[in-house]
Amino acid sequence: MTHLKRALAIAAVTGAGAAALMAAAPGASATASRVAYNGACGSGYTVVNSTEVGDKGTAYLTYSSATGKNCLVAIRNVAGEPVPMTIYLSRSDTEIHDIYDSGDYRSYAGPIYVSARGTCVDWWGWIDGVRFEKAETNCG
């Protein structure tokens, strides 16, 4: 009976450990899939906001206090064959939305810039058909 109890205890511990590893794996891969900001906006720009674009990538909004400009770049999680990508960036206090980048890209779209010191910005777009949209953010 002692051997049976010991075998059951080992099986329970092994099963719990395997279940814990399996439960942790999806979270670990989801975190690992988020791509880091690539510095495409240039020196002096710091990330002030970001949003995941489904499982396709991440859009990063950056700001330079020296220039008063915001910059937007969308980066794919996995670079590869070109896919359609479009990003827009505008001041929230205007109806003019002519600052954009659009094309088929292997790794990222942008950077695009708008002078927005003292006002909010709107930024939106898509990566391979998956849309993101942020309105009236990062005011100031």
Q: Over which residues does each language-model region extend?
A:
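N-terminal prepro-regions of secreted/extracellular proteins
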Residues: 1-46
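Post-signal peptide N-terminal regions of Sec-secreted extracellular proteins
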Residues: 29-140
